[in-house]
Regions:
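FAD-binding glycine-rich core of flavoenzymes that anchor FAD
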Residues: 2-31, 49-57
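Extended, hydrophobic alpha-helical segments in both membrane/secreted and soluble proteins
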Residues: 10, 140, 158, 162, ...
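Glycine-rich phosphate/cofactor-binding loops in nucleotide/flavin-utilizing enzymes
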Residues: 139, 248-315, 403-447
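Short Gly/Pro-enriched turn/cap motifs at secondary-structure boundaries
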Residues: 33-36, 65-68, 80, 105-112
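Glycine-rich beta->alpha junctions and the first turn(s) of the following alpha-helix
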Residues: 99-199, 264-269, 273-355
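C-terminal helix-coil-helix/basic helical segment that borders enzyme active sites and/or dimer interfaces
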Residues: 170-171, 175-179, 198-229, 242-245, ...
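A short core secondary-structure module
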Residues: 55-99
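A structural signal for short hydrophobic beta-strand segments in well-ordered beta-sheet cores
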Residues: 43-47
Length: 447
């Protein structure tokens, strides 16, 4: 609420009440036909006129999937007022306002989730957040940078806990004369790649959080990138942690089964990850167009400068990947391939991977270690190299595949333009670096 332009009297009144009465607040936006797409809003707020002035509003409609919906004391509710989508404060117990039953969910089962119903619920005009109608969607978007980055941290933490449980198990589980954690195939398939992604995600989340601290707003695309990358990584890590524990992982005796159920919601709420892909694509597509293709080439130049200063983090390779991304985006523009929604989704994914890898190189290349990191500088460099190489290879190969699958480009020319052979030539050392990371994981988590 402090990010939204309340009248000063509103801030003092509501914040004092929240503090003194320990009020729990719920966020009421989602509807049956308006999930990640809030434009489809159906809940209405009609004027109540007295002596020619707007005295208040009567809200009618319903909400669903509201966190703390049945237990909150105060609700921020998005409704369509005559002037456009607007947020209103509604107190529990207001006549006509009812809370539905707690949903029986797949995961986060202790978190209350319920629907809300409004039958001509009257609220005074002072309860219009911001004091002006029609600002609701802008107000919601203003906090997406924060809220989606918060969910990114959820996904990262859940994935880490799952993999750390698996490492602990692998350090003690003896197979074929030694612990599972010493088996290269086990580690490089089920454990090590996840921790490399975690550290990349941590670097990006930290970088974006610092920007938010300075700018106090915006970063909607960056928040979407963080949420998409970290929650996809956390969800896949939890799934592989179950596999890493074998039959034990499938039982409720071990935490990984619960983590897998809980982490899945991070790929859904605060905007599904498909909406994140679309949001990322839209934001960076505009940057590509405005810069006439220079946006990712400029970041590539930055990576080359980092490589000149610190050649041990793979920044030169992700620079090739970023230039490949610029080429793929330009081919999509020239051939009008973004008319295919699937391609826009996949572009969003490639963009997210590229920007996270660049942030990782930026942090480690400049000697910045995120607070709370478990790894020394040399291990982080090895992680960064692996991530940069694999991300660049993925961008060049999958980006070319996207263009070729829907367009008419010459395959050989496209592979040359995306620097595919150069990227391939830089893949040397990935297994060796991954083994170094595995050794450090065994050391850190051996109890």
């Amino acid at each position: 609420m402090q990010r939204i332009p309340f009248p000063e009297v509103g801030i003092a009144y509501w914040f004092n009440r929240m503090a003194k009465e320990s009020l729990m607040v719920a966020y009421g936006a989602t509807e049956a036909d308006a999930g990640s797409d809030l434009v489809s809003l159906r809940t209405r707020a009609e004027h109540v006129i007295e002596n020619g002035q707007i005295k208040g509003y009567k809200i009618t409609g319903s909400k669903m999937w509201i966190s703390s919906g049945a237990v909150a004391d105060l609700y921020t509710v998005l409704a369509l007022a005559p002037g456009g989508p607007s947020w209103f404060l509604v107190e529990k117990g207001t006549p006509g306002f009812t809370q539905d039953k707690h949903e029986d969910k797949h995961g986060i089962r202790l978190s209350n989730t319920a629907g809300l119903s409004f039958d001509e619920v009257y609220v005074p005009a002072a309860n219009l957040i911001g004091g002006v109608e029609g600002k609701g969607l802008l107000q919601a978007q203003a906090v997406f940078g924060y809220t989606r980055l918060m969910v990114a941290a959820f996904g990262l933490g859940a994935g880490e806990e799952a993999i750390e449980t698996a490492i602990d198990y692998a350090n003690h589980r003896i197979q074929a004369g030694g612990p599972l954690s010493e088996k290269q195939g086990y580690m490089l398939k089920l454990i090590t790649p996840h921790y490399i992604k975690f550290e990349a995600a941590r670097a990006f989340i930290d970088e974006t959080a610092k920007k938010l601290d300075v700018n106090n707003h915006g970063q909607a695309t960056e928040g979407s990138i963080g949420k998409y990358y970290a929650t996809e990584a956390g969800n896949k890590a939890a799934e592989d942690a179950i596999q890493a524990l074998g039959g034990f992982g499938y039982t409720k005796e071990f935490a990984v089964e619960k983590i897998k159920r809980d982490v899945k919601i991070t790929c859904i709420y605060e905007g599904t990850n498909e909406v994140m892909e679309m949001t990322i694509y839209r934001g960076r597509w505009q940057e590509h167009l405005k810069s006439r293709g220079a946006y990712y080439n400029n970041i590539a130049d930055e990576m080359d400068a980092i490589h000149a200063k610190n050649p041990e983090v793979g920044a030169n390779v992700i620079a090739l990947g970023l230039r490949a991304l610029a080429t793929v985006l330009e081919e999509c523009r020239l051939q009008r391939l973004t008319r295919h929604q699937y391609i826009t989704f996949k572009l969003g994914e490639l963009i997210a991977n590229a920007e996270v890898a660049a942030a990782f190189c930026r942090a480690i290349g400049n000697g910045k270690i995120v607070e709370g990191c478990k790894f020394d500088a040399e291990t982080l460099k090895a992680m960064c190299r692996v991530n940069a190489k694999e991300t660049a290879y993925d961008i060049a190969s999958r980006g070319a595949k996207l263009v070729l699958s829907a367009g008419t480009a010459d395959a050989a020319a496209l592979l040359n333009a995306t620097h595919f052979v150069q990227i391939e030539a830089n893949m040397h050392g990935c297994i060796e670096d991954s083994d170094k990371v595995s050794a450090k994981l065994r050391e850190i988590f051996r109890k």
